[in-house]
Amino acid sequence: MAGHSKWANIQHKKARQDAKRGKIFTRLIKEITVAARMGGGDPGSNPRLRLALEKAAENNMPKDNVQRAIDKGTGNLEGVEYIELRYEGYGIGGAALMVDCLTDNKTRTVADVRHAFTKNGGNLGTDGCVAFNFVHQGYLVFEPGVDEDALMEAALEAGAEDVVTNDDGSIEVITAPNDWAGVKSALEAAGYKSVDGDVTMRAQNETELSGDDAVKMQKLIDALEDLDDVQDVYTSAVLNLD
């Protein structure tokens, strides 16, 4: 199965994530706390917590911070009660946006999200206005040059749903959300190290943006990601920023 080129987008995303690394710990602590509250403190039986712990390890979060977040979630330590919220809307060129938040103040969060949309050329929509265009799935990206047949065999044996070869030669392994961490671990054990991966909401129909429109859309995404209550921003936009 073939896919479009996304190598440049991956590199661009990584550069932006590195620039925002100061906020990553705060978001991870929130996610670990909520995951532990919803499904318990054992990552073996809690896929959401396992994913959050994978991300914490990738970002070198101190183990004490991780354990405190788990303890707050399970009630062993007193902590803030976060509410999960999802907002949907439209960006430049009608590109779809989904914004996931964890907050202790819904009124503040919706005001901040609406302001970010309005100030940057977008529109906050109603519940369900773009959700139909997204599917919840995990993905792992491998550099061009990896033996496609061998990787496909290992991935499918590990429980992956699909393997996609992109136009630029990179290979993408698609998983069910709860299987992502297990597939990643199995492939690493087989000698396949991914260069990018996550559990995401992926747009089924994408919106290509270039020039000023791409720059404006990036500004809107950045404004949303910079909000303290925002955990993740998903979009149908494919940005050609070169």
Curated annotation (Swiss-Prot):
Gene Ontology CC terms, in alphabetical order: cytosol
Keywords assigned: Cytoplasm, DNA-binding, Transcription, Transcription regulation
SUPFAM superfamilies recorded: YebC-like
Localization per record: Cytoplasm
GO BP terms, alphabetized: regulation of DNA-templated transcription
GO molecular function term, any single one: DNA binding
PANTHER family the UniProt entry points to: TRANSCRIPTIONAL REGULATORY PROTEIN YEBC-RELATED, TRANSLATIONAL ACTIVATOR OF CYTOCHROME C OXIDASE 1
Family membership: Belongs to the TACO1 family.
Protein known as: Probable transcriptional regulatory protein NMB1648
Species in which this protein is naturally found: Neisseria meningitidis serogroup B (strain ATCC BAA-335 / MC58)
